[in-house]
């Protein structure tokens, strides 16, 4: 049981792309590059961001990763939060010595510009990456993000409350907000909490939702482990292996091919 409550406390902090669930990174049409370039040159940060997305789109003839990075940087410097987040993510993929300091700088700026992004900034404090580990500070930023409508922020705030053994009604309120906003790791964490403390069937249903709709691999594995019916076990085994295979696990790909013959 102690291990279960550790999972409840940490499950939401799986390193998911929480911001991409709020703001789509899909590129605009390739043929509007010139228009956005012109607006960007006039100081429009959003236009710089859109131009960067086009330059970053491999299906566009103008694709130029180096120039795209310049435009993302410019969009951030002009006060467009998405550009700052993109720059932070770009640094997260490097092994540069200044990696964590850069990520913190860009995420902090994004949080200042758009409170929805304070969730990502809070995660830096939760993990202690680029910032001294401080769960109280993380909790503050999660709440700030939640207050302006970021479901991920609400889910992370709920987990912070749960770790502090706050009233379960308060915890579930914020999990519900996160889950209803389609932040599916929130559904998983909510399901585990319900399963442990309230109603096992209802809890399992929320874990299923996290797997079925949100492709949360850990939720699929949990449902698989808790299932007693063979038909359900096979269904969730397939989903779990498929997600693992998509993550690059070659053994899970091989196992998936085996069960396709069942």
Tell where the protein language model's regions lie, with residue ranges:
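Hydrophobic face of amphipathic alpha-helices that form TPR/SEL1-like repeat modules
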Residues: 50-57, 85-93, 120-127, 156-164, ...
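Short helix-capping/linker turns of helical repeat alpha-solenoids
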Residues: 42-45, 57-59, 77-81, 93-94, ...
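Terminal, low-structured helical/coil segments at or just beyond the last alpha-helical repeat
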Residues: 222, 232-262
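Classical Sec-dependent N-terminal signal peptides that target proteins to the secretory pathway
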Residues: 1-21
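N-terminal leader/linker segments that initiate helical-solenoid repeat arrays
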Residues: 17-53
